[in-house]
Structures are given as structure tokens and as C-alpha cells.
Amino acid sequence: MNSISANLNIMIKASEKASKILIRDFGELEKLQVSKKGPKDFVTNADIKAEKIIIDELKKARPNYSIISEENGIEKNKDETNFWIIDPIDGTINFLHGVPHFAISIALQSNNEIICGLIFDPIKDELFYAEKNNGAFFNNQRVRVSKKNKINDCLFVTGGRMKNELDLPYRKSGCAALDMAYVAAGRYDGFFQNELN
């Protein structure tokens, strides 16, 4: 097992705690309250509850750090050089439709640079994380990107529409965070998406 920083450990604990709520709510989809943020952007009470748990856990450990979260926006605190960046459910549409492919993502930005981040799949209990100068890991095992060098042997993933003029093999999964984690772990060979925010 590799050694991880205190900040990454805090993020892992926060994501594990929030995942319990998501798993419970995922099992009771018909009871979820859903509202629309935009034309293709939904928020559930599960998003809000999970985000609150994550923020509470992060603030408990680092009360002065600022926060950028999907549901609450920017919350500047005493320390404006360190920002937690939180998406409590990446893949909300999947979550809403009972598709077990969504994730919690948390990153820490320090002095305008991401220094560590994680993507946690609560359904599969898969944790992907990376830390500056320490590498990328999946459930405590170092990961590497695919070594395929022939484009026709590759499998790509996208979250958006794609003109497939090159006839490339690709998938659309509905969870950009997991798509990128899967590229890091060599499950997919590449990821692209327009208008990712």
C-alpha cells in the first residue's frame, strides 16, 4: 500500500461517508425529489445530502479551506489559496434512472494547481485517486494508462455527441469522472468531451 497525504485521507473518508447515503437513496429511486437546474441538468435531494456530508467532513478537518461545490457554488473562507472542489454525484442522470454508473469526485486545489483528487464509485466500491508527485492508484494499486498504440485496437469513451468519421470504437457512459478514471487505469484508451464543466 502506498502512503497518502492527510488531505487525501480526509477526502477518502468524506467520500466513503457520503457514499452510504447515495447507496441507500439509489435503492429507493422512486422516493427521490428531483428538480431541474438547466435543460439537461438535474439535481436530486441525494446530491444535496451527499454534498452536505462531504462539506461537513472536509470542514471538520480543514475549516479554513475554501470550497467549490456543484450545488452550492463557491464558498470563500479564510484560506483562499486552498479549495476543495466537489461533485457529489457525477452521472446524476444515470443515478436517476437506476443505472449503477455514477461517482463522487473531490479534488484539492492549492495555489491554482490541483494537488490531489479522487473518484469513488460507491456501487462497485472502487476508489481511484492521484496525488502530485505520488502517482495514480486504484484501490491502493498503482495504475497506468493503456499501452495500445494502434488506434483500431483502442476503445474510446465520450460524454457528448461524436461525429465518428474515423469509425473509432467508442462508448458513452454518462459519468465523465469514471470515464477519466478508467482511462488512467487502462480500461479505456482515451476520453473526450465537448462542453465539460
Describe these PLM feature segments:
Residues 1-89:
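N-terminal subdomain of lithium-sensitive/metallo-dependent phosphomonoesterases centered on the IMPase/IPPase/PAP
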Residues 78-137:
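DPxDG-like acidic metal-binding loop motif
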